[in-house]
Amino acid sequence: MSSTPLKVAVTGAAGQIGYSLLFRLASGSLLGDRPIELRLLEITPALKALEGVVMELDDCAFPNLAGVQIGDDAEQIFDGVNLALLVGARPRGPGMERGDLLSANGAIFTAQGKALNKVAADDVRIGVTGNPANTNALIAMTNAPDIPQARFSALTRLDHNRAISQLAAKTGAAVTDIKKMTIWGNHSATQYPDVFHAEIGGRNAAEVVGDQDWIESTFIPTVAKRGAAIIEARGSSSAASAASATIDAARDWLFGSADADWVSMAVVSDGSYGVPEGLISSFPVTTKDGDWEIVQGLEIDDFSRAKIDASTAELADEREAVKELGLI
């Protein structure tokens, strides 16, 4: 394990997800015993609150927290970073149309993409958690032409984890018994959680469940709309679970997915499974040494095909919308 601190940037660091994420990062959930240097970006009005969060980080006396830098200037914060977790995004407010949301976030992720392109470390990897995550990642990637496209990913690990949890609850299996879960498409209500290639204790998950109606009518909508259900229950969006999934995704990306298993990541499509090239869409991937590879050769039946196509059509619509706005 290297003793050189890994420089990790977090945007929206004073927000709800940031508050859950920073203490996990500082305590070693991502890097274990390797030192970490946190670079925290916020908008100017939130810097005071962020100072309070840093006071709390100091008060934890984390042994592997090598340093914390905060600021509102992306180029300063991103300078030399090895990992950028783009959590901050403009939430959808009352009366906002989808185009308004894409436009507001487009400005944020255009600027951040350009800053990363200019000053990030040569080995940088960029994970986008802020929604709409897939299209925000596409905007950042397009504005960072010198960074390899494979270094950008959007978070669908939260959906992946939600799907595993629902399947475990249904079957009585432990979450550790469930392998090869896949989320296809967009991190939105059109996403497709696919149990037909998943395994529970080595057996096909759909066969173990043995209830196609439950898969279609309960499982898929529960996973796809889980975020809305959490807002309804707690009055604000899922933050701790999103932070946890952000760590899971980054850890597997940097250190590799488990043998005989795969994970879900939204990455740039090479045309696999009929997903239009260049879209940032969720796929089953294996990871090793900081690189990912789309799992090939999975049979896609008509039911799955229709679900994947519906979600990728939404992604194509979003790409068209941000093109019209001049963001890519």
Curated annotation (Swiss-Prot):
GO terms for biological process: malate metabolic process; tricarboxylic acid cycle. This is Malate dehydrogenase. Pfam families: Ldh_1_C, Ldh_1_N. The gene is mdh. It comes from Nocardioides sp. (strain ATCC BAA-499 / JS614). NAD(+) binds at G12, A13, A14, G15, Q16, I17, G18, N105, Q112, T129, G130, N131. Keywords: NAD, Oxidoreductase, Tricarboxylic acid cycle. PROSITE patterns: MDH. The keyword Methyltransferase does not apply. Its EC number is 1.1.1.37. InterPro entries: L-lactate/malate_DH, Lactate/malate_DH_C, Lactate/malate_DH_N, Lactate_DH/Glyco_Ohase_4_C, Malate_DH_AS, Malate_DH_type2, NAD(P)-bd_dom_sf. PANTHER family: MALATE DEHYDROGENASE. Belongs to the LDH/MDH superfamily. MDH type 2 family. It catalyses: (S)-malate + NAD(+) = oxaloacetate + NADH + H(+). Catalyzes the reversible oxidation of malate to oxaloacetate.
